[in-house]
Amino acid sequence: MIDLRLLRENPDIVRASQRARGEDPALVDALLAADTARRSAVSAADNLRAEQKAASKLVGKASPDERPALLQRAKDLAEQVKAAEAAQAEAEQAFTAAHMAISNVIFEGVPAGGEDDFVVLDTVGEPRAIENPKDHLELGESLGLIDMERGAKVSGSRFYFLTGAGALLQLGLLQLATQVAVQNGFTLMIPPVLVRPEVMRGTGFLGAHADEVYRLEADDMYLVGTSEVPLAGYHADEILDLSAGPRRYAGWSSCFRREAGSYGKDTRGIIRVHQFDKVEGFIYCKPEDAEAEHQRLLGWQREMLAAIEVPYRVIDVAAGDLGSSAARKYDCEAWVPTQQTYRELTSTSNCTTFQARRLSTRYRDDNGKPQIAATLNGTLATTRWLVAILENHQQPDGSVRVPAALVPYVRTEVLEP
């Protein structure tokens, strides 16, 4: 949720953010009205409760002649208090709904627009000239790394088996990511992949894209699309000690996405699938430290991309493609030879206080006063990276060179048919 002080003091900033995202700025006015109505309802209920309390005291001191009228007055006030509290509850509910409807306020400089309106910040490496490149699925099948046919037989479309060296390659990639994370002060976590609705809602994943999330209706639980979700809920309703600096966690988990809005997109191979594995960095920090932590997350992602030796670029994601929780997001996109374009491998988002406010995650400032923490997240490795590794390191004979950093995990320098 956004900061109400910002809303009240400078609603135009929030309206501008909504417009840049392609979202309705009228929601800002609806929230302002709901905020006013809520505060009015709270004040009315408080005043009536005070009046009721005073009337009750008068009853105890009243003479026999005065008592009947005062008792009637107390009874009337009790009914009014009951009605006022119901009105307050209704106003609170309307306010919460209006508050939850507004996305995080973007940072100044974030490009306006949608998916195609990003700004390229940096390009690293030169794509290698490959004559008649094979795509990752053709390579994966010929090398015995990927089995889409049996994945579909067992589970349906967009499912797959990673087999033999393919499984070793993914495990090696994820282990390398955990090594980078631990060396940089992250605590490694293997979190649950089923979460309660309040945690999924608190992280912002039950808004406009709720249809992307798998729900187990019988248990009212959700399968996570990223370990960002359980890691964000890890410190819900807590006051953290951040006096020694940010708390950094790296979550290794399977992830699940319905890809409901992706019909017809990336139907071949493992670029867009329903289940994959990922190591996700997640950080709790003071708001004033968040931008520096964001750059650090991006730096660790660059370190991982350098390790797999693929050309990539860094983009500043446009406001309409951020997701509701992020105030700024950087994507690292790797070159995919068969598509002659760059495809997303990592994202890192600065969610400022948006998620922590929803989940009531706080820290104590220098004066001991509780304040809302900031949260950030960023991919350190995921299954999709196999696409970039296989395609960029393919050889004319159909083999694939294993990046040096992954050789100890795969136990070979070349994957051969």
UniProtKB/Swiss-Prot annotation:
<feature type="binding site">
    <location>
        <position position="273"/>
    </location>
    <ligand>
        <name>ATP</name>
    </ligand>
</feature>
<dbReference type="Pfam" id="PF02403">
    <property type="entry name" value="Seryl_tRNA_N"/>
</dbReference>
<keyword id="KW-0067">ATP-binding</keyword>
<dbReference type="GO" id="GO:0016260">
    <property type="term" value="P:selenocysteine biosynthetic process"/>
</dbReference>
<dbReference type="InterPro" id="IPR042103">
    <property type="entry name" value="SerRS_1_N_sf"/>
</dbReference>
<dbReference type="GO" id="GO:0005737">
    <property type="term" value="C:cytoplasm"/>
</dbReference>
<protein>
    <recommendedName>
        <fullName>Serine--tRNA ligase</fullName>
        <ecNumber>6.1.1.11</ecNumber>
    </recommendedName>
</protein>
<feature type="binding site">
    <location>
        <position position="379"/>
    </location>
    <ligand>
        <name>L-serine</name>
    </ligand>
</feature>
<feature type="binding site">
    <location>
        <begin position="226"/>
        <end position="228"/>
    </location>
    <ligand>
        <name>L-serine</name>
    </ligand>
</feature>
<feature type="binding site">
    <location>
        <begin position="257"/>
        <end position="259"/>
    </location>
    <ligand>
        <name>ATP</name>
    </ligand>
</feature>
<comment type="pathway">
    <text>Aminoacyl-tRNA biosynthesis; selenocysteinyl-tRNA(Sec) biosynthesis; L-seryl-tRNA(Sec) from L-serine and tRNA(Sec): step 1/1.</text>
</comment>
<dbReference type="GO" id="GO:0005524">
    <property type="term" value="F:ATP binding"/>
</dbReference>
<dbReference type="InterPro" id="IPR033729">
    <property type="entry name" value="SerRS_core"/>
</dbReference>
<dbReference type="InterPro" id="IPR010978">
    <property type="entry name" value="tRNA-bd_arm"/>
</dbReference>
<keyword id="KW-0547">Nucleotide-binding</keyword>
<dbReference type="GO" id="GO:0004828">
    <property type="term" value="F:serine-tRNA ligase activity"/>
</dbReference>
<comment type="subunit">
    <text>Homodimer. The tRNA molecule binds across the dimer.</text>
</comment>
<dbReference type="InterPro" id="IPR006195">
    <property type="entry name" value="aa-tRNA-synth_II"/>
</dbReference>
<dbReference type="InterPro" id="IPR002317">
    <property type="entry name" value="Ser-tRNA-ligase_type_1"/>
</dbReference>
<dbReference type="InterPro" id="IPR015866">
    <property type="entry name" value="Ser-tRNA-synth_1_N"/>
</dbReference>
<dbReference type="InterPro" id="IPR002314">
    <property type="entry name" value="aa-tRNA-synt_IIb"/>
</dbReference>
<keyword id="KW-0436">Ligase</keyword>
<keyword id="KW-0030">Aminoacyl-tRNA synthetase</keyword>
<keyword id="KW-0648">Protein biosynthesis</keyword>
<keyword id="KW-0963">Cytoplasm</keyword>
<dbReference type="GO" id="GO:0006434">
    <property type="term" value="P:seryl-tRNA aminoacylation"/>
</dbReference>
<dbReference type="Pfam" id="PF00587">
    <property type="entry name" value="tRNA-synt_2b"/>
</dbReference>
<comment type="similarity">
    <text>Belongs to the class-II aminoacyl-tRNA synthetase family. Type-1 seryl-tRNA synthetase subfamily.</text>
</comment>
<comment type="function">
    <text>Catalyzes the attachment of serine to tRNA(Ser). Is also able to aminoacylate tRNA(Sec) with serine, to form the misacylated tRNA L-seryl-tRNA(Sec), which will be further converted into selenocysteinyl-tRNA(Sec).</text>
</comment>
<feature type="binding site">
    <location>
        <position position="280"/>
    </location>
    <ligand>
        <name>L-serine</name>
    </ligand>
</feature>
<dbReference type="InterPro" id="IPR045864">
    <property type="entry name" value="aa-tRNA-synth_II/BPL/LPL"/>
</dbReference>
<feature type="binding site">
    <location>
        <begin position="344"/>
        <end position="347"/>
    </location>
    <ligand>
        <name>ATP</name>
    </ligand>
</feature>
